[in-house]
């Protein structure tokens, strides 16, 4: 899903829980969107002025000010800015307060990442920010992945991948130069927590290396104790 002008959607994620903010950000990057994060209200307002996001994911409970105060400020400067509110509060009056303050939609913690993505997609369509879903070519160095045709090329040569290998590579390319832990890969590619007992990630990383690197300068690297990273060959 892209903006009406063909550019990637820019999302501002505002949450004072770093792990949660990173989890949401990673899922949205997987959608091909550009992500900016802020951990408090003041930073959020500054980031919105600097980045001009297309949509905001805003936690109601922030350390320096209420998320609703942030919402009022954002709306005073950009009345049409779509905002999805996140909160641990589940009382009806809290939901009403958030929507009355100008929030376009509301998700209560704990939530599924899939729900956040779907609500953002619907919100972007409803507010006219985006038009139609559009696949994209992901490019990292001489590695190219086409999300529409599922074709993969390395140095101009086709690479044949299984569906799971393709999803793993796509996830790594959306997060190129970022270290991805085994748990993050399991959650995104397999949507299942094996409790650290499975070697399925190691197995599929090995499969990808044989097909992607295959005698060339390596792009897939292991950081012992941390995870895996895909980056352009030197």
Curated annotation (Swiss-Prot):
Q: Which Pfam families match?
A: Response_reg, Trans_reg_C
MF terms per GO, please? Answer: phosphorelay response regulator activity; transcription cis-regulatory region binding
Its post-translational modification remark reads: Phosphorylated by TcrY.
Gene Ontology biological-process annotations: cellular response to iron ion starvation; phosphorelay signal transduction system; regulation of DNA-templated transcription
Q: Which residues bind DNA?
A: 135-232
4-aspartylphosphate: modified positions: 59
**What happens in the null mutant?**
Cells lacking TcrX and TcrY show an increase in virulence in mouse model of infection, with significantly shorter survival times.
The cysteines covalently paired via disulfide bonds are: none
Q: Which residues form the Response regulatory domain?
A: 10-124
Instruction: Give Gene Ontology CC terms.
Output: cytosol; protein-DNA complex
Q: Which UniProt keywords apply?
A: Cytoplasm, DNA-binding, Phosphoprotein, Transcription, Transcription regulation, Two-component regulatory system
User: What function is annotated for this protein?
Assistant: Member of the two-component regulatory system TcrY/TcrX.
> Which protein are we looking at?
Probable transcriptional regulatory protein TcrX
**Annotated organism of origin:** Mycobacterium tuberculosis (strain ATCC 25618 / H37Rv)
Lineage of this protein's species?
Bacteria, Bacillati, Actinomycetota, Actinomycetes, Mycobacteriales
């Amino acid at each position: 899903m892209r903006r009406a002008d063909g550019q990637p959607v820019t999302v501002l994620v505002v949450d004072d829980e770093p792990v949660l903010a990173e989890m949401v950000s990673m899922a949205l990057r997987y959608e091909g969107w550009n992500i900016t994060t802020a951990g408090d209200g003041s930073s959020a307002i500054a980031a919105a002025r600097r980045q001009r996001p297309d949509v905001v994911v805003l936690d109601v409970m922030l350390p320096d000010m209420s998320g609703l105060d942030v919402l009022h400020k954002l709306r005073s400067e950009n009345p049409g800015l779509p905002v999805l509110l996140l909160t641990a509060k589940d009382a009806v009056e809290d939901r009403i307060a958030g929507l009355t303050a100008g929030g376009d939609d509301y998700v209560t913690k704990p939530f599924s990442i899939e729900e956040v993505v779907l609500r953002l997609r619907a919100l972007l369509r409803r507010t006219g920010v985006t038009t139609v879903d559009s696949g994209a070519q992901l490019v990292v160095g001489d590695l190219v992945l086409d999300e529409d045709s599922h074709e993969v090329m390395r140095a101009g040569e086709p690479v044949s991948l299984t569906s799971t290998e393709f999803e793993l590579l796509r996830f790594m390319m959306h997060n190129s130069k970022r270290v991805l832990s085994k748990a993050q890969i399991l959650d995104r590619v397999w949507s299942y927590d094996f409790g650290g007992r499975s070697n399925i990630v190691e197995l599929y990383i090995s499969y990808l290396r044989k097909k992607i690197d295959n005698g060339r300068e390596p792009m897939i690297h292991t950081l012992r104790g941390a995870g895996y990273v895909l980056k352009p060959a030197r």
